[in-house]
Amino acid sequence: MVAIRMISVLLLGLTVSGCASIETATRNAPLDVGGLEAPAVAVDVRDIRVSVPETLRVSEANAYLPAGDIVWRGDPPGNRHDQVKAIFEEALQRGTATMTPGHLPVVVEVEVARFHALTEKARYTVGGMHGLHFVMQLRHAETGALVGKPELIKANLRGFGGQAAIEADRIGQTQKVRITDHLANVIRQELSGPDGYVAANLRLGGLSGQL
């Protein structure tokens, strides 16, 4: 059982993100999906379920901004859907593992919507942004009822380029390490306060954004 501390379970928001050289995570208008309107309560995470739909398109093109929903080079060539799922599972387990359990038993369901990391071409030249999008929904662990509404979270992370990327790799801060740590922090904040994870509203720079 994974424990988390007090949170506000008013799950609102819908956002999109793209590729640029900033770090950000935002939430927007609520999805029009039914569910229990939950008050601020302490929750107890009983399970974490991650899905990466097969409909998400994988790109292996070595371009600055390749088309596709999944762009990932931080693991050896293989099933990118499975690799992305493993990253999210590790991040969510780590992000909730140290939190204190509350009174409402829940399952955290996450569906990946976009996982757009940097290609070799971008990483070793100008850098950019890792576009990390996922839909999160809480469900009552015993009744299966929805708790609050699902939200699409944009949890983007600035990706190093050029010499900075080389130095990051040298000290063990690979794309995989940084993205996993970042997602763990995002989910911890999302499940720890009434406003969830909200990053600074920074100007875009470097590569242009891509929806």
Describe each region flagged by the PLM.
Residues 40, 76, 80-84, 88, ...:
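Extracytoplasmic/periplasmic, Sec-exported soluble proteins
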Residues 15-18:
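C-terminal motif of bacterial Sec signal peptides marking the signal peptidase cleavage site
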